[in-house]
Amino acid sequence: MEVELEIKGKKLVLQTGIFAKQTNGSVLAKYGDTYVLCTVVAEKTPKEGLDFVPLTIDYQEKAYSAGKIPGGFFKREGKPTDREILVSRLIDRPVRPLFPDGFNYETQGIASVLSYGDENIADILSIIGISSALTISDIPFNGPVAAVRVGMVEEEFILNPDNDEAEKSILNLVVAGTEEAVTMVEGGAAECSEETLVEALKFAHTHIKKIIALQKKLQQLSGKPKREIISLNGDEEIQKAILNIIGGKIENALFLPKKVERQQALDELLNECLQNLNTEEFRQKLYGNFDKDISLEITNAFDKVIKKFMRESIVKKGIRADGRKSDEIRPITCMIGILPRVHGSALFTRGETQALVATTLGTSEDEQKVDSLEGEIFKTFMLHYNFLPFSVGEVKPLRAPGRREIGHGYLAERALSYVIPSKDEFPYTIRVVSDILESNGSSSMATVCGATLSLMDAGVPIKAPVAGVAMGLIKEGDKTVVLTDILGMEDHYGDMDFKVAGTEKGITAFQMDVKISGISYEIFKKALKQAKQARLFILKKMAETISEPKKELSLYAPRIYKIQVKPEKIRDIIGTGGKVIKGIIEETGVKIDIEDKEGIVKIASSNESAAQKAIEIIKGITQEAELGRIYMGKVTRIVDFGAFVEIMPGVEGLLHISQIADKRIQKVSEVLKTGEQIPVKVIEIDELGRVRLSRKEALREIENRTATKT
């Protein structure tokens, strides 16, 4: 069974009934030569006590899909790559909000790339395919949802740009939505305007609706009846009981200005509820079973009560938990150069969110090699985000970065990538690390701000400073409030998380997730307007600390020097088996990188004298003999017809016996000795570059110069 839709001259095909038939839902999504198998499976029984949708999404790229064999010793796919993690998150975000309340069945969706073409669409197909698989399955799902990518070339929007179009595009936007509205946005841009972004969403949604209609057609042909959700009763009764116990105390606890104090007060209220409600009498009344532990049910109901209080306070009273107005930004402090041995460092604090950001400059040896289905990619700019457990007062083991950390780091990296200088302008590999020391909302945007400060402190000539802010939304009926610089609580209990980063001129990165059925373009415009005001305010605050990149690099950063040589001279620098270049490195301690085709030699060292020494050695190796010039050369070999003299490193010339002296010489060894330093003049360089020397002309010229001086 399959349905199809033509997009840009190629068919989007959704096929079911052939692959993976033991799943709850399975769809093969095809476009051009790109095939993605999308499957969903849900457990048959629910899990009790969950306050979230137990959904796991995994995206995997099979090496065989691009005709490749994986590298490494084992020659098979290993742990998920960063790209696979990022696409997994991209699929998850528009799908998760569409599961109904009370859905407690563990569910897994897997998107496997089986064939990889040059359409640049595997991630988009995965979102469409997972949604289609859920739509035709028996799993309750308030979809379907669809996605497209939007590019922009010469001020025209392009739907699902291929690899060639993507290279020219100034916009890279993934938009997902339902039939009614856009629900997820992620992308980057070369300083685009807010108006352009809104128009891009409208353009995207027009095509999203066509793909949703295609999924509904597939559902009509092969959809299964949806299973009923077995929900546990008693939640409303528990909420009423909670209000009877602590109703008069919630407001005082919820509106304490500090996060730690607020959380402590709320924890005390929760404990009071647990002590009063997790009793035999209440359990018997609620479930007819006094042995049942209902602490999880009480905790979940308590969370809903607090959520309702916070939202009503914002919508009806205009009061946020920390006392701010809806468009007010928390206090900001910026510090730079705080770590003496680090090439660039900054501490950015916004309210109770704090990022310590460090910049390290390296050479081409430090570039990150990324294996992808499209081939090897070398990254010269990297940003890594670390969320440390103490930042929220927790005790957790330190492990490898999780999905959230990789996603936040990528968002911040994307925001800054548009202002990072090209390799020709700044020949360094740049690594930025953001360690979150405190967190109460918007740590990824604090990373963007801190990274900008750190890069400028390191002397990286970025095109413009970048700042970011997280926006939120509370929607109750017809009333909506857009929040600027949201707290963690406002993110958790709110209806939207919208992160916007950019320069003074425009937006460079954005990420939006809507937890409700969608938002209108009017609300979206308002959020963008508030975000721009906040961004400009933050940029101004950052400029008070540092307004442009430092002119000098850190004393401890490597200096990179470029030398242009003839490409044919590269082999002389390297030497047989790398002997010459290794010798230079051992003697000077520098790093040397050679671009063979261009004839560019890069020398890197934090010690300027060592770098200059290496430069002189390389210049000596690559310089060519100059006709008519006198050199002090070393006799390297004596032969019957003359001698070979090295006039510069790697350059030898023939000194014929007739050119040794004015008088006739019987044996060369009577006049010259191996290793002897003698003056010689270059008298000929033939077409093959062979050099002929004359000692007698050199002596004669030196004698004439001396006589002239006296």
Curated annotation (Swiss-Prot):
Cofactor annotation: Mg(2+)
Any GO CC annotation of this UniProt entry: cytosol
GO molecular function, one term: magnesium ion binding
S1 motif domain segment(s): 628-696
SUPFAM superfamilies (alphabetical): Eukaryotic type KH-domain (KH-domain type I), Nucleic acid-binding proteins, Polynucleotide phosphorylase/guanosine pentaphosphate synthase (PNPase/GPSI), domain 3, Ribonuclease PH domain 2-like, Ribosomal protein S5 domain 2-like
Reaction equations catalysed: RNA(n+1) + phosphate = RNA(n) + a ribonucleoside 5'-diphosphate
GO biological process per UniProt: mRNA catabolic process; RNA catabolic process; RNA processing
Chain positions recorded as Mg(2+) binding sites: 491, 497
Domain KH positions: 558-618
Predominant place of localization: cytoplasm
One of the Pfam families matching this protein, by short name: RNase_PH_C
EC id: 2.7.7.8
Alphabetical UniProt keywords: Cytoplasm, Magnesium, Metal-binding, Nucleotidyltransferase, RNA-binding, Transferase
Record-linked Gene3D superfamilies: GHMP Kinase, N-terminal domain (3.30.230.70), K Homology domain, type 1 (3.30.1370.10), Nucleic acid-binding proteins (2.40.50.140)
Highest taxon of source: Bacteria
Role this protein plays: Involved in mRNA degradation. Catalyzes the phosphorolysis of single-stranded polyribonucleotides processively in the 3'- to 5'-direction.
NCBIfam families for the chain: polynuc_phos, PRK11824.1
Record protein name field: Polyribonucleotide nucleotidyltransferase
